């Protein structure tokens, strides 16, 4: 029975609009239509009628279909009749011919289980086996035995058939069997409004001023006109912007990238003081402590020591004993300057602390200095060259520092050749008028200045071997006497191959040389001479044996004894 309710789109075997077709898949035909038919369940759309296809000629079957859509394929339920009483094979003979199975059977699966079987049948006119093949094709869908066992109310066994006619002989893959469109069948009638659906003229978007029922507002819809929509769209560009959210945990982060903010962040601490983590102690090339002249020291009184950095550095030094404490003369309290700050920070504009220091030097000497040139010079050279000097001195092993202290000529040459001592601007190294003429003539290196300040000068009151009062510490003197009492060659003491094993390069790499001692060389030469003598003696013995065997062979050929 065809569903003819008002809400159904399928009426009297036709669909209410073009484009709707009954085109189920193989799984839908077996699992829904065939299974529900066998289980005596109701179908939502009765598009398949019950017809015995084996008792009717194929040309008459389209008129018996419940589908009147004009499609060129039809569906039928047929009770299965057996050819033999005790066999499952069906009888496919008709009054005008017979249906013959062709091709391979296809198993229909659903949820990874077999639910049915599909066969392809072709109609032949006449009696078997001399029938004439026609273009009528039918697909037979049968349910699997296990799936059939799931039906509890099964009373009769059906098979589902899909019938269509090909356009000609041979396979017709992809051929469409839908009904051809005819415009005359879908002419609208003003009197027919059965399936019309009422659509509101205006969309319902908001509610206001509705009556209240039990403290709950019951809102009535308000229609939004087209003019209101245009007004809302025009007000969007003038709408106020959305305020950005502020997070409390990021309040202290400086907002902005101005030069003042960056300078304050990098150069100033919370109290406005400039903190230099490196100490400013300086040493002469011969390893002695250098103390600036009192007149020069007076120009540095514009700096103030930070309150917390110097004690921290002193505590760190007291916790460890380094090789420098044993080999280098003890440093006085005045040897290490404290980190300083400018009283009037920013007095010279963009000139940094090194420019102000060079300006103080020029004032002390009575000369003028261009602060802009000094700023460019320090910015280009201070960060690179001074960092290299500082790391080369700070990260030396205690043994290398000892060798550099005893024979500092190599380090000074490297310092003067590779760094900016060769520059024509060497006059920037300010020396007091009474500086010693032989201060830098000594080929002494090895002890680099601890501070990164390039300004170096010599005070004549300090000479080699003096510190404060001009005397060495008792512990250092005793240690040197102990080292001098060790019986060893000078090469192993200060200029041995161990000192020249690692040569520091500009790229911070190391070239390794194999060093051998003089004693080992003498032993090796003596062993070579003994081995050469043994080899010569062995060669002479071999030659004598060869001559003997040659004479013996000659006598044997001649047939007479050797001594006769």
Curated annotation (Swiss-Prot):
Tissue specificity remark: Expressed in roots, rosette leaves, shoot apex, stems and flowers.
Keyword Nucleus listed: yes
Location of this chain's protein in the cell: Membrane; Nucleus
Gene3D superfamilies for the chain: NAC domain (2.170.150.80)
GO biological process: positive regulation of DNA-templated transcription; positive regulation of leaf senescence
Segments crossing the lipid bilayer: 535-555
NAC domain mapped to chain residues: 16-166
DNA-binding region: 115-172
Keyword Nucleus attributed: yes
Gene Ontology CC annotations of this record: membrane; nucleus
Assigned keywords, A-Z: Activator, DNA-binding, Membrane, Nucleus, Stress response, Transcription, Transcription regulation, Transmembrane, Transmembrane helix
One Pfam family matching this protein: NAM
Protein role: Transcriptional activator activated by proteolytic cleavage through regulated intramembrane proteolysis (RIP). Transcriptional activator that promotes leaf senescence by up-regulating senescence-associated genes in response to developmental and stress-induced senescence signals. Functions in salt and oxidative stress-responsive signaling pathways. Binds to the promoter of NAC029/NAP and NAC059/ORS1 genes.
Description of its domains: The NAC domain includes a DNA binding domain and a dimerization domain.
Annotated protein name in UniProt: NAC domain-containing protein 16
Protein's organism: Arabidopsis thaliana (Mouse-ear cress)
């Amino acid at each position: 029975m065809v569903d003819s309710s008002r809400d159904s789109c399928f009426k009297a075997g036709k669909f209410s609009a073009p484009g709707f077709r009954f085109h189920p898949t193989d799984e839908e035909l077996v699992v829904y239509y065939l299974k529900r038919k066998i289980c005596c369940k109701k179908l939502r759309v009765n598009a398949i009628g019950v017809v015995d296809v084996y008792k009717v000629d194929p040309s008459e079957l389209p008129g018996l279909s419940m589908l009147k859509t004009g499609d060129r394929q039809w569906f039928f339920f047929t009770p299965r009749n057996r050819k033999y009483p005790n066999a499952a094979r069906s009888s496919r003979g008709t009054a005008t011919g017979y249906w013959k199975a062709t091709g391979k059977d296809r198993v229909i699966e659903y949820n990874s289980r077999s639910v049915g079987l599909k066969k392809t049948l072709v109609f032949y006119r006449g009696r078997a086996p001399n029938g004439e093949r026609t273009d009528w094709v039918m697909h037979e869908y049968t349910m699997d035995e296990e799936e059939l066992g799931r039906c509890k109310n099964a009373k009769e066994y059906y098979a589902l058939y899909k019938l269509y006619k090909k356009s000609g002989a041979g396979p017709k893959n992809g051929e469409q069997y839908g009904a051809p469109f005819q415009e005359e069948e879908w002419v609208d009638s003003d009197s027919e409004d059965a399936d019309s659906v009422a659509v509101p003229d205006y969309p319902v978007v908001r509610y206001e001023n509705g009556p209240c029922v039990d403290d709950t507002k019951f809102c009535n819809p308000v229609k939004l006109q087209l003019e209101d929509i245009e007004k809302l769209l025009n007000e969007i560009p003038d709408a106020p912007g959305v305020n950005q959210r502020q997070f409390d945990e990021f309040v202290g982060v400086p907002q902005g990238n101005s030069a003042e903010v960056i300078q304050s962040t990098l150069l100033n601490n919370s109290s406005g003081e400039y903190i230099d983590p490196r100490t400013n102690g300086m040493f002469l090339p011969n390893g002695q402590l250098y103390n600036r002249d009192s007149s020069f020291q007076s120009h540095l009184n514009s700096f103030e020591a930070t309150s917390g950095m110097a004690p921290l550095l002193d505590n760190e030094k007291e916790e460890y004993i380094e090789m420098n404490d044993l080999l280098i003369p003890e440093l006085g309290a005045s040897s290490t300057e404290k980190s300083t700050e400018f009283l009037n920070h920013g007095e010279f504009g963009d000139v940094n602390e090194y420019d102000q220091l060079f300006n103080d030097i020029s004032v002390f000497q009575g000369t003028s200095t261009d602060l802009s040139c000094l700023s460019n010079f320090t910015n280009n050279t201070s960060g690179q060259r001074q960092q290299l000097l500082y790391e080369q001195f700070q990260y030396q092993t205690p043994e290398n520092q000892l060798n550099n202290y005893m024979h500092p000529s190599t380090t000074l040459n490297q310092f003067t050749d590779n760094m900016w001592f060769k520059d024509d601007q060497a006059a920037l190294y300010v020396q007091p008028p009474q500086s010693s003429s032989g201060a830098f003539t000594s080929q002494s290196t090895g002890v680099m200045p601890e501070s990164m300040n390039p300004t170096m000068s010599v005070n004549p009151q300090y000479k080699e071997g003096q510190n404060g009062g001009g005397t060495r510490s008792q512990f250092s003197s005793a240690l040197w006497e102990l080292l001098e009492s060790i019986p060893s060659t000078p090469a192993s003491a200060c200029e041995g191959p161990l000192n020249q094993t690692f040569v520091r390069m500009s790229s911070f790499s190391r070239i390794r040389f194999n060093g051998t001692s003089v004693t080992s060389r003498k032993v090796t030469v003596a062993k070579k001479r003994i081995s050469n003598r043994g080899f010569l003696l062995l060669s002479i013995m071999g030659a004598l044996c060869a001559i003997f065997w040659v004479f013996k062979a000659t006598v044997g050929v001649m047939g007479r004894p050797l001594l006769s």
